[in-house]
Structures are given as structure tokens and as C-alpha cells.
From Swiss-Prot:
This is Hydroxyproline O-galactosyltransferase HPGT1. Residues 1-12 are cytoplasmic. GO terms for molecular function: hydroxyproline O-galactosyltransferase activity. Expressed in roots, rosette leaves, cauline leaves, stems, flowers and siliques.
Amino acid sequence: MARKGSSIRLSSSRISTLLLFMFATFASFYVAGRLWQESQTRVHLINELDRVTGQGKSAISVDDTLKIIACREQKKTLAALEMELSSARQEGFVSKSPKLADGTETKKRPLVVIGIMTSLGNKKKRDAVRQAWMGTGASLKKLESEKGVIARFVIGRSANKGDSMDKSIDTENSQTDDFIILDDVVEAPEEASKKVKLFFAYAADRWDAQFYAKAIDNIYVNIDALGTTLAAHLENPRAYIGCMKSGEVFSEPNHKWYEPEWWKFGDKKAYFRHAYGEMYVITHALARFVSINRDILHSYAHDDVSTGSWFVGLDVKHVDEGKFCCSAWSSEAICAGV
């Protein structure tokens, strides 16, 4: 009986050993498999990183690799957001509320800001404009509050800054308070395009208006006709409105309308369609576009050509409005030469 019991115990011990051996073997295969998978993942990530970066440097840890990949994804997201912001800027969105000179926010959105281009020696013309349609003092404020029309003379500085001509403008402005003085512009024909560009930029930054108009100081503006015409274009976010024209580009240096960059307009030397420079209007979004891109917008010899060139490659509605042809006066005309 003792021999039989001893045999049973020996058999049971062998079975336990066999089971333990099998379990250990399976565990070894499992651990080896997991280690193999992790090593393969590590190798794949390293190879992928080398492929993307073009570098065959020594392997880095998986954690560092994942951090690099996550960082790149964040950069892609940031780039996408920057593109959306750029697009929003081109649409005319602004991130701040426009304010008046005293720091208070505007309550009613102006219809249009009119910049009247004037020169240092043109006081008589300015006085004629004030008397004819612009007004001064209380009447100028009434034009803003009741009609939503802000009118300002736009002028640069003398080539000799601080001279008697500059002081004369400062004195006049202290009496009338109806100037936009652009300190970065020298009053000279060759800076006319820069003057218009900086006016649009300044006005768009200061006033949140529906429209912005460029005019000259020897025309009469029919405010009621202007308001009626602009009201018809309130739903168009990118409109360029004026008396449209095109014509010959003059390459002769002695010609009145000489264009130094005439060769850019092709063999036929013809301008693209653009508005006469006496008066034209652009919408808020286009004025914001000029403001944002003021440093890279090219200027030609003539300001009306320059303005047209800024919009020729954009999705802009060109409105050929005969009422802006100031030389053809009628009862419905918006402007007329004086």
C-alpha cells in the first residue's frame, strides 16, 4: 500500500510540473510577442519620422516621437487658423470697435467717409467746398448725425516740414477741425497715389463706415444723390463704384499723363478698367483690405490707376455709375466740376 501511494504522489507531481512548464512557455511567448509589437511600433515611428524630416539620425524614444508628431499637428492647426484669420481680414472684419478722437465709441454707423484731396495752397477751393456742400461747425456735425456723411479734407505735409505752409494748415484746421493730416505724405504729385492709399487706411481704421469715397477739392457733391445711390449697394460687401474708363498708357516722358511703368500694361499700352479720379467709392471690406495691405500695394503714377490696380485681381464688383461722371452734370448727378 505504501508503494502504491508513493506512485500516485509521483504521478501527480509530474503533472503539476508539466502544467507549470506549459504555463511558463505560453507566458514567455506572450511577453515576447508584446515586446516584438512594441519594438515594431518603435521602429515604424522612427522610420516615419526619418522619412518626414529627411534625417537618418539615431533613434529617439517613442514618447519624444509622439510629442514631435503632436507638435506638428498643432502647427498645422495654427496655420489653418492663420489662413482663416487672413480670409476674415480680407472680408473686412475688425477685432476692435472704431473710436472717435476723444476715445468714445461711435453709436450710429456712418454711411460714407468722404476724403477730399487738397493741396497746401488751395484754401480758396476749400472755402468754396465748405460753402457749397460740406459746411462747417454745426452744419458739418449735422451732416454727420443726420445724413451719416463724414467729410474731411485730406492733406500731407510740406517737403520742408514745419515751414509756414504747414503752420498755415495747422492754423486752418484748429479753426475748422475738418482735416485729415497725413504726416507720412509729402504734398507732391508723385505721392498722390500714396496719399489716397493712406487716406483709405486711416479712414477705415478710425470710422466703421459702410463706404469710403475719394474726391477732389474742385467738385460739388450732391449729398442726397450720393446717399440714394450708395443705399442701392449696401448688400454688396466688395463694390468699387465710379465713372469707369480705360485708355491709352502714355510712354513719352514729356506727356502730361506719363506712366513710368508703361511696359507693364502690355504691347497695346492700354489701362485696365478703373474709375475716374474725380470721385469714386469703395466698400468697407475693400477699405480694410487697403489698410491691412498698405505696405505691399503697388502705386502707379496716377492715383486712379493705382486704386483700380489694387482691386483688379480681387473678387470685386466694378460698378460703372454714370452719376459719378463729374464732367456730365445732370439733376441726378452725384458730382460736378466747379
